[in-house]
């Protein structure tokens, strides 16, 4: 805790409000609300916390607060601040999570369509459905029963659906608008669960067709009746009153929360929404934040009723949702809430079970690898790979895996300094010497295992430096690839031998992940460096364009192509004098090519562990 935070903690009021945590860059990383700002904010910097809260606190270098008149006002402000700033430690619902709806359009001749966008356009919307497949299944059934308009053909034409009996051909039929509006109402009744009348009509038509010896048509009506029955079976009735409601339940354990929302439409449970996330406040307060965000999503229509658990502030939810809010005490509605809570508990337990299994697999892999190589369990593994093209821009990279998982903050990148031309062995010698010379000088913790992406030659070079030059006792292994550039063999021992390692084992998969990751990291760094060198060389020799201005151009435009496409005015905006900007354009566009402004997404050249070793 720095002096700034200590000073601000003394100034905190006991009022309700919101607090805003910031990191060293001034970025908002967490927004919270409190009934008592002083007690809540001070709690972050006193006593011990679980791992996730410690991670948050370790990044806080400043905070602000906003006093509100009430707890509910603080809740509403918190939701808006989260939506505006998207802090990384807050609950964030996925923006792209939308469900399909069946829509009866508000047109002269209505259409039946599937949509994910709900608009206030006078149309009727039914849903949400669990996925587009479920929505299409219902729509296909409705298309067979109700011949709505399917196309926008001119008055003299009919569409394909007319010929198969699924369109009335509104352009030529004698039916008026009232007929189609009546049909739309029947569909609406059907989607609301009132399908008895439709089944009775189909049964009557089936009987008439059978009496008229039209057995194929009678069979079609029979199939439609059976399809409706199947649909009824899939959509279990959860409440006899056939209301539309959302049912919320939540469960907390080990610092995590799971919220489940049941979508009950016309008394039938048609879908659920599941979200798991770490929580930092009291569970009931973070639950309220979740509810507020939930109904900000356009795809979440507000139903007639919202059911919530007993421990939630009913008035706070009413401030968030314009609907009837209930905390049921007994009966069907209470059972629905209990079911949502039970499912939240099961989902959270499954998460922890899967996590434990994943940890067991990874831990088992590194333990088995240690036994296989007859070394202590390699908790920390450092791996190296070189990258160059015909000796140009040679680089090397190191990735680190701790407990079988990437530790990206420990990744390192190396520009090769002493090697001329494509000499992979010499490059490996330089990098190993630089890395472990530093480990030795600064008394850094050495790895339990070094893995070289290469064969016998590269491994022997690493051994010479580590064991003979530096006198360090660190096991070194090599990973050879086959002609398809896939992980093939593990080399280890003195002399080096191929280790008998099953390709289906967790140990092999771990080594494969390490080799793929170090190769990716090295080649990404090489491409960046090559691009930068190409950029600089083409801008050499321009009067008034020194290293600093080149760097500014690179930072702003990200690529030489975008500088070529930029106008002189755009280059001037970066801080380059106009006469120099004109010289840049003359050199990059010697043929006087037309310049155009291209709006493209900027490339982010920041990568993991963006550190260069000395």
Swiss-Prot record:
One of its GO terms (molecular function) is excinuclease ABC activity. Residues 14-91 form the GIY-YIG domain. InterPro entries: GIY-YIG_endonuc, GIY-YIG_endonuc_sf, GIY-YIG_UvrC_Cho, RuvA_2-like, UVR_dom, UVR_dom_sf, UvrABC_protein_C, UvrC. Residues 599-614 have a biased composition (Basic and acidic residues). Coiled coil: none annotated. Gene3D superfamilies: 5' to 3' exonuclease, C-terminal subdomain, GIY-YIG endonuclease, UVR domain, UvrC, RNAse H endonuclease domain. Residues 595-614 are annotated as: Disordered. It is found in: Cytoplasm. CDD domains: GIY-YIG_UvrC_Cho. Residues 196-231 form the UVR domain. SUPFAM superfamilies: C-terminal UvrC-binding domain of UvrB, GIY-YIG endonuclease, RuvA domain 2-like. GO terms for biological process: DNA damage response; nucleotide-excision repair; SOS response. GO terms for cellular component: cytoplasm; excinuclease repair complex. Keywords: Cytoplasm, DNA damage, DNA excision, DNA repair, Excision nuclease, SOS response. Interacts with UvrB in an incision complex. The UvrABC repair system catalyzes the recognition and processing of DNA lesions. UvrC both incises the 5' and 3' sides of the lesion. The N-terminal half is responsible for the 3' incision and the C-terminal half is responsible for the 5' incision. Belongs to the UvrC family. This is UvrABC system protein C. It comes from Streptococcus pneumoniae (strain ATCC BAA-255 / R6). The gene is uvrC.
């Amino acid at each position: 805790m720095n002096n700034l935070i200590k000073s601000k903690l003394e100034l905190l009021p006991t009022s309700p409000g919101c607090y805003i945590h910031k990191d060293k860059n001034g970025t908002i990383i967490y927004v919270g609300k409190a009934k008592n700002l002083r007690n809540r904010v001070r709690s972050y910097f006193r006593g011990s916390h679980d791992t996730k809260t410690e991670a948050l606190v370790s990044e806080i270098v400043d905070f602000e607060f906003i006093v509100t008149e009430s707890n509910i006002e603080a809740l509403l402000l918190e939701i808006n601040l989260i939506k505006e700033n998207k802090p990384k430690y807050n609950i964030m619902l996925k923006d792209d999570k939308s469900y399909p709806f069946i829509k009866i359009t508000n047109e002269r001749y209505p259409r039946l369509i599937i949509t994910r966008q709900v608009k206030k356009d006078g149309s009727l919307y039914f849903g949400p459905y669990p996925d587009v497949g479920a929505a299409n299944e219902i729509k296909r059934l409705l298309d067979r029963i109700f011949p709505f308009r399917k196309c926008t053909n001119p008055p003299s034409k009919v569409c394909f659906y007319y010929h198969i009996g699924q369109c009335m051909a509104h352009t030529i039929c004698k039916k008026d608008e009232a007929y189609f509006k009546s049909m739309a109402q029947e569909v609406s009744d059907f989607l609301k669960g009132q399908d008895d009348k439709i089944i009775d009509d189909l049964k009557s038509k089936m009987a008439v067709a059978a009496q008229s010896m039209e057995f194929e048509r009678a069979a079609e009506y029979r199939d439609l009746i059976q399809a409706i029955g199947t649909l009824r079976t899939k959509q279990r009735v959860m409440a006899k009153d056939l209301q539309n409601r959302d049912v919320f339940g939540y469960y907390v354990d080990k610092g995590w929360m799971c919220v489940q929302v049941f979508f009950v439409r016309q008394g039938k449970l048609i879908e659920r929404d599941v979200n798991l996330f770490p929580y930092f406040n009291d569970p009931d307060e973070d639950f309220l934040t979740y509810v507020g965000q939930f109904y900000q999503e356009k795809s979440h229509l507000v139903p007639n009723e919202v059911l919530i658990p007993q421990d939630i502030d009913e008035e706070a939810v009413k401030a968030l949702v314009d609907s009837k809010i209930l905390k049921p005490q007994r009966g069907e509605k209470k059972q629905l809430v209990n079911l949502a809570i039970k499912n939240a508990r099961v989902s959270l337990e499954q998460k922890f079970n899967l996590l434990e299994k994943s940890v067991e697999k990874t831990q088992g892999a590194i333990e088995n690898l240690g036994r296989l190589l007859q070394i202590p369990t390699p908790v920390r593994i450092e791996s190296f790979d070189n990258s160059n093209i015909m000796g140009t821009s040679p680089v090397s990279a190191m990735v680190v895996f701790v407990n079988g998982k990437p530790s990206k903050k420990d990744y390192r990148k190396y520009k090769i300094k002493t090697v001329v031309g494509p000499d992979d062995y010499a490059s490996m010698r330089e990098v190993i010497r630089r890395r472990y010379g530093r480990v030795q000088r600064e008394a850094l913790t050495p790895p339990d295992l070094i893995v070289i992406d290469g064969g016998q030659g590269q491994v022997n070079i690493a051994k010479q430096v580590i064991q003979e030059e530096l006198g360090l006792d660190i096991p070194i292994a090599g990973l050879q690839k086959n002609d398809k550039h896939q992980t093939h063999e593990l080399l280890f021992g003195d002399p080096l031998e191929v280790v008998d390692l099953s390709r289906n084992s967790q140990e092999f998969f771990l080594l494969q992940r390490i080799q793929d990751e170090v190769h990716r990291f090295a080649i990404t760094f090489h491409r960046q460096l090559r691009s930068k060198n190409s950029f600089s060389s083409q801008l050499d020799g321009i009067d008034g364009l020194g290293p600093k201005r080149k760097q500014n151009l690179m930072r702003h435009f990200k690529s030489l192509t975008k500088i070529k496409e930029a106008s002189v005015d755009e280059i001037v905006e970066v801080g380059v004098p106009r006469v120099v900007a004109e010289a840049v354009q003359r050199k990059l566009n010697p043929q006087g090519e037309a310049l155009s402004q291209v709006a493209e997404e900027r490339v982010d050249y920041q990568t993991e562990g963006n550190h260069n070793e000395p």
